[in-house]
Amino acid sequence: MLFSSITFLYYFLPVTLFLYYAVPDKLKNLILFLASLIFYFWGEPKYSVLLLFSVLSGYCGGRCIEMVKKKKSGVKESKGRTDRVVLAFFISFTLALLIIFKYLDFGIFSINLLTGANLPLFTLALPLGISFYTFQIISYYVDVYRGDVLAEHNFIDFAAYVTMFPQLIAGPIVRFRSIQKELGQRSITFEKISDGAGRFVCGLCKKVLVADNLGMLVSYLEKADEGHWILAIAYTLQLYYDFSGYSDMAIGLGKMLGFTFPENFDHPFISKSITEFWRRWHMTLGGWFRDYVYIPLGGSRCGMLRWCFHMFVVWFLSGLWHGAGWNFVLWGVYFGILLSLEKLIGNTKLFQKESFKTAGKICGHLYVLFAVLISFIIFRVENLNDIGPQILALFRGHGDISAAVAYEIKSYTVLILLSCIGATPFLRDVWNRLKGTAFWEKSGWLLQTVLIVAGLLLSTAYLLGSSAHPFLYFRF
């Protein structure tokens, strides 16, 4: 079931919210869990059992890790490694499910490619959301092991955490420790519901009115094999509005349910370095790899060569997380190289001079935009043999663009320009300034209501005239 579908907007969500608000607080997590199962079953019935199995194993894993740690509390450290073994077992077991369903065919394909063998593929469909809920469960294991959180003893509460429909399919990656208190007790106010509805509709408009329309231009230009610069820009904007739109919708739904989810995007295209870009793009994934891979490896507290190895591991895995394909691995390694080069260059005395810092601010934006455009060509093109020609096409003249392609591009000019403006903090800053005015004190609620209703109706009108498009990150 898609957030951007009539079924979700006018059937599932109203019924779920009505029941959720109507029942006593002690039953809210049960309603949330059952609603999330229906939500998942609607779109992925054959893998619903896998989701439930993952929930059960995650619950048992947390309890076992906590139990072993309590037994170990009176044992000398040198003799007590049982908790590490238990942690490793449950992490390995949880990862095994992800590897089987997401990477098994990719591994067989790679072996066939390298050795000339003809091993049969299993052609397993990718379960929706498995990359996201697997990472949430692993973070829960590690946090229980570290003592950052207590293992959840209430199965329904834990199940509600893992399966929570707002963020189940495509994030944000919500850590248990960030919402553990809210799982037990949370307040639901009119202000939270109103703010959540506004955030949800904002994300809906991003998805339906911007990302889906840009997607049609991307599909057209891919077939036409012309206008490669516009294609690269349109796809980058489509991916941003599609994924940030989903994140906005998830955060808004979470707020309507009384939860505070972490932010996932913070205007990444205003960044002046790739390092800054990845602090603003898919922030919950970057934070996950930092806390559960990069820092445990040793982080930056080592020599430069060792640090480069840490970066390679993190970005190789990050690329692989995004998809079972060598283009995704290449995409991850590409960013790992850029980030390593930024640190190497930034550490030299020459580039620490004030004159170079000033020049960096001027050129940084252009560098980031160009590097990101190139990266998403690698991301989009699945065949490795086609990546080079697609990038070279940006710099190779093709003569005049055909009249049909030129007309198509012109018809999207306003949308692309508005999308570029919307990707900056401009609209956010205008909105925040408006909130500080006397007009807002008097009529802000009315303006907010009008915008929410208008955005919902406009998106609905568009959905009625076309089929709902799946979110791009569903395939990851």
What feature does the model see in each segment?
Residues 1-475:
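Membrane-embedded transmembrane alpha-helical bundles that form the catalytic cores
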